[in-house]
């Protein structure tokens, strides 16, 4: 009987040892702690999973209350959102890159993103499954469930790290392509500016005779304008002299006409004056003859 009990105990211990895998140390990605925003978000998710993997009393309590899965969902969404934002930022700088190369890099990065998202989703589903299994045990011992969960979490964290490293490498290739494209753009701009400066210098050299001809033409036009102005001033002086001559002639003609009028009317006036004087004299004489002489008293 004792032998049977001993065999049973050995079998149980062997089974427990088979279920619980030896814990393999997972390398902590220190680069996630200080890098791009998506790396910082992934670092927060990694730290949270490491805390969940401890399966402490607080962790188990929050697992049963769905708090862990809710927090994990927020961290997953934040991480994937930052990855997408960083990818979009790099894509804007990939202009000079060939379209086929850009399409290939984008496809590879999308695949890495999908694998990373699937890893996160599997972690969450495994935690939900653990919650359902614990609730189904109705107060019975859950040590075996915790052991299996710890084993799964170790495997999932290793897979998550592998796929996160893959995403990081793909983004590094993207970033290198963006930097190369930026350098090509700067080089093209420099070449273009150099070409424009050379063209400007050549145009300046070729435009020198044009400027000289323009200056000569301007001097010629200025001389012509001055000549025309001088001629106009001379003509104006001539017109003024002619007007003065006309005025003098008109004054002389007016004086001559006045003299002629005077010579016409003066004899007539004198004749009328003389006749009037004679008439008045006759009237006076006639009036004197008709007046009676005063009578003399004796």
Curated annotation (Swiss-Prot):
Residues with the Methionine sulfoxide modification: 137
Pfam families cross-referenced by the UniProt entry: Apolipoprotein
Transmembrane feature ranges: none
GO biological process: acylglycerol homeostasis; cholesterol efflux; cholesterol metabolic process; lipoprotein metabolic process; melanosome organization; phospholipid efflux
Stretches the record annotates as 8 X 22 AA approximate tandem repeats: 74-244
Superkingdom of this protein's organism: Eukaryota
Disulphide-bonded residues: none
Protein name, per record: Apolipoprotein E
Organism field: Dolichotis patagonum (Patagonian mara)
């Amino acid at each position: 009987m004792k032998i049977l009990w001993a065999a049973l105990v050995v079998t149980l211990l062997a089974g427990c040892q088979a279920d619980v895998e030896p814990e393999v140390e997972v390398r902590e990605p220190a680069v996630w702690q200080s890098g791009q925003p998506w790396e910082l978000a992934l670092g927060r998710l990694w730290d949270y999973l490491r805390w969940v993997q401890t399966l402490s009393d607080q962790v188990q309590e929050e697992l049963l209350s769905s708090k862990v899965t809710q927090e994990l969902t927020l961290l997953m969404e934040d991480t994937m959102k930052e990855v997408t934002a960083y990818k979009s930022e790099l894509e804007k700088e990939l202009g000079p890159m060939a379209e086929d190369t850009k399409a290939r890099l984008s496809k590879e990065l999308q695949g890495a993103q999908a694998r990373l998202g699937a890893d996160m989703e599997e972690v969450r589903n495994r935690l939900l499954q653990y919650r359902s299994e614990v609730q189904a045990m109705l107060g019975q011992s859950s040590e075996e469930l915790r052991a299996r969960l710890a084993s799964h979490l170790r495997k999932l964290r290793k897979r998550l790290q592998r796929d996160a490293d893959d995403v990081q490498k793909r983004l590094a290739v993207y970033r290198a392509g963006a930097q190369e494209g930026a350098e090509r753009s700067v080089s093209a701009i420099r070449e273009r500016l150099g070409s424009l400066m050379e063209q400007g210098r050549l145009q300046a050299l070729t435009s020198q005779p044009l400027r000289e001809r323009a200056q000569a033409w301007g001097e010629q036009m200025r001389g012509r304008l001055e000549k025309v102005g001088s001629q106009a001033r001379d003509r104006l002086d001539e017109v003024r002299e002619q007007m003065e001559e006309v005025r003098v002639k008109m004054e002389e003609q007016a004086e001559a006409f006045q003299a002629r009028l005077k010579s016409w009317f003066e004899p007539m006036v004198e004749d009328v004056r003389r006749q009037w004087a004679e008439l008045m004299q006759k009237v006076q004489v006639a009036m004197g003859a008709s007046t009676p002489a005063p009578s003399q008293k004796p």
